[in-house]
Amino acid sequence: MEFAGKRLKGLIAATFTPMTSNSDINLPVIKQYVDYLVQKQHVRNIFVNGTTGEGMSLSVQERKCLAEEWVKQARGKMDNVIIHVGCLSLSDSKDLAAHAASCGADAISIVCPSFLKPSSLDALVLYMKEVAFAAPSLPFYYYHIPRLTGTTYQICELLRKAKENIPSFRGVKFTDVNLMDFGLCVSQYKEFDCLYGVDEQLLGALAFGAHGAVGSTYNYLGKKNGDMMAAFEGGNLQEARKIQCSLQEFLLFVFDMGWGLPEFKDIMSQISGIPLGPPRLPLYSSVKSDHHDSIRTKMLKLDLI
């Protein structure tokens, strides 16, 4: 089967999973979330149940319910809903892939298993093929995030093998700082969508020819990142650098506080006004109410909101 249709491009928000105070999934919030992304952040693509969405901490049934609701609420408003279906269990991944196809998702993606890891690149591609064949009508993307999976195969070589073995393969979500490998993916496999996943280095990836970007900060800084992409595409490198440096300064402020994914969920709630709730254990947010003013002040100073 050939997939010669639409390409994934532009910004793709890696969505947080809304939860109640008891850390149960909170489906009614998703409509408000979709409207906020489209109307306030000008983001029309989402990546659901990935790292930002705490996908590995959710049950298969929860992930199915979330996929259905995101697809339902995005219909007619968004361009693409990509469902991450990666699990530690191959059968669960195949089940989620088939479900994503049945509920109307636009594409699927999987991350490399991170406990019992594939022993070789060939084994990983075989694993990918099994999942892709469970939803042969959907474009399939590999999600590369070696910092969490511990799997460091060269992705330009993975693209070659995937091209030979997986008819529905369409590209990679590349969440790593290795811009040489990323650049080779872009230059050697122009038929694939190469989506960059390190928000603070997006401008560098654009210089290498990134087709788009998937990230958590595009939930609440989507418009500003869109401005940076427009400046780059228009040849205004000075403005693009200015915006990227402001975004980096904000992220450095956050990282220096020792914060990560749990705190980014809190920041999204604060900036958007959407009640996303807490992360699910073992994640735990250390943001206190007295931090909110300093976060907003920093973002205002950097002209990010």
UniProtKB/Swiss-Prot annotation:
So which domain of life are we looking at?
Eukaryota
Q: A cellular component term (GO) from this record?
A: cytoplasm
**Alphabetical list of Pfam families matching this protein:** DHDPS (PF00701)
Pathway(s) this gene product operates in, as recorded in its UniProt entry: Amino-sugar metabolism; N-acetylneuraminate degradation
Residues the record lists as binding aceneuramate = T51, T52, T175, G197, D199, E200, S216
Q: Its function?
A: Catalyzes the cleavage of N-acetylneuraminic acid (sialic acid) to form pyruvate and N-acetylmannosamine via a Schiff base intermediate. It prevents sialic acids from being recycled and returning to the cell surface. Involved in the N-glycolylneuraminic acid (Neu5Gc) degradation pathway.
What binding partners and quaternary form does the record give?
Homotetramer.
Under which name does UniProt file this protein? N-acetylneuraminate lyase
Q: Which organism is it from?
A: Xenopus tropicalis
Name of the encoding gene: npl
